[in-house]
Amino acid sequence: FEKVKPINEAMWARAAEITGVPGIAEEYYGYYKDASAFGACSYHSRYALYEGCKTGSKDGQPVAPLMGNMKGFDGGAGDFQMGPLTFMLNYPDHCVLYRFIPRSITETDMELVWYVNGDAREGVDYDKEKVAWLWHHTSLEDEYIITRNSEGVNSQFFEPGPYHPEYESTLMEFISWYLSTIAGLKA
């Protein structure tokens, strides 16, 4: 985290002016046990992209017109959480919403929805394959990892290990909230 701190701080300093969105770099954490009410998880943070990247695309260059009140590209992306199982990654020109839908103890569906400016016309202002490229590939890679992890966890040889307190703290919070929830305890 220290390695990217100066890059993030530089992006945060310019974000509101370049994007035209006051407070865009302000963080908010209110999820799982810290949510204002059951299921009312909400979270926002903004972080810098790689040098020279304006958006989340194959080459880091814009794939659609700016959305909403955005005035420019600040080299950042916003992470949002809405409820315990719905997340959104927002770039100035597009965003992807992903929702996890548990179906059973071993099955979960993941729904992905991409958004662009409401006035943008497919094939004219954006190419949906270019908009979806990064998170389509990321989701395929995630599915591969998750499937292999599930096979391992369901193996008779599986022995759980500890979570990393720095890199997996959010996962640890989710598990604590989830176990309390299914046990009928107040989260």
Which residues make up each language-model segment?
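C-terminal catalytic domain of Rieske-type non-heme iron oxygenases
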Residues: 1-187
